[in-house]
Amino acid sequence: MLSLLSSDSSLLSLLFLFLIPCLFITSYIGFPVFLLKLIGLIKIKAARDNEKRDEGTYVVREDGLQRELMPRHVAFILDGNRRWAKRAGLTTSQGHEAGAKRLIDIAELCFELGVHTVSAFAFSTENWGRDKIEIDNLMSLIQHYRNKSNIKFFHRSEVRVSVIGNKTKIPESLLKEIHEIEEATKGYKNKHLIMAVDYSGKFDIMHACKSLVKKSEKGLIREEDVDEALIERELLTNCSDFPSPDLMIRTSGEQRISNFFLWQLAYSELFFSPVFWPDFDKDKLLEALASYQRRERRFGCRV
């Protein structure tokens, strides 16, 4: 009983301390104005409480990654398929097939972790210099992304698929299939898989320059209109809401970007994994993302 009285007394004291200032304020500014201000303060407090309560959802507790620090766009250079196959006593074709399957697995993991855009250097312009059998295998593997299982994944997870590159040497039948999958998924907004096929960073920049020259000749743009933002709109990655990767991952231990996203990687964080692409699994992905989240991105400025 004493504890109850004590509790009630404390409550009455708190109410008294609250009401006295309120009565003074209302007599000074008027009750309606005071009421509006009080409601506004309550709303602000509720919003802040919601932010604090939601902070727990930002951390992916299983692996310790923070969702608010997750890269929006992760780019991959899929390197090491042939060496992986040779080490395993398999054919080059089997190595590329394993690499194609791995891309879907890793893309799905990225999307689950909150990454918006995943891009992959699937076939470079320089790859045309390889022997015809391997080129044919690589072209056929692009069709792998249109098999029933992957199509179901794209629609189930609402993944938009885009294929960027020169495309002038790609067989007409394959171009038709590429167009079909792009059209079928173009309505999806929150997840985006970009595959660079017959792509090079130099070609991308050259393509943008030619487009700007044509627009200038037609009087659509002036010299003073040309800035970084305008050039970026002409790059092939303009299909993405986040055209510049926050993180670029290359497998196989090679430490170079090999003519991939020369403009877009200007301020990207780079991570080089020693494993061949078919061996790049969830643990390796989490390792790369954890490394990214520990870094302080300065974008050329001192902090």
Curated annotation (Swiss-Prot):
A Pfam family matched in the record: Prenyltransf
Keyword entries, A-Z: Endoplasmic reticulum, Membrane, Transferase, Transmembrane, Transmembrane helix
Tissue: Expressed in low levels in the whole plant. Preferentially expressed in roots.
Cofactor(s), by name: Mg(2+)
InterPro entries: UPP_synth-like, UPP_synth-like_CS, UPP_synth-like_sf
Location of this chain's protein in the cell: Endoplasmic reticulum membrane
GO cellular component: a single term: endoplasmic reticulum
TM regions (residue ranges): 14-34
Biological process, per Gene Ontology: dolichol biosynthetic process; protein glycosylation
Coiled coil, from the record: none
EC number: 2.5.1.87
MF annotations from Gene Ontology: ditrans,polycis-polyprenyl diphosphate synthase [(2E,6E)-farnesyl diphosphate specific] activity
SUPFAM superfamilies, sorted: Undecaprenyl diphosphate synthase (SSF64005)
Membrane topology annotation: Single-pass membrane protein
Pathway the protein contributes to: Protein modification; protein glycosylation
Superkingdom of the source species: Eukaryota
Location, primary (coarse class): endoplasmic reticulum
Catalytic reactions of this protein: n isopentenyl diphosphate + (2E,6E)-farnesyl diphosphate = a di-trans,poly-cis-polyprenyl diphosphate + n diphosphate
Alphabetized HAMAP family for the sequence: ISPT (MF_01139)
Entry similarity comment: Belongs to the UPP synthase family.
Function, as annotated: Catalyzes cis-prenyl chain elongation to produce the polyprenyl backbone of dolichol, a glycosyl carrier-lipid required for the biosynthesis of several classes of glycoprotein.
Protein's UniProt name: Dehydrodolichyl diphosphate synthase 1
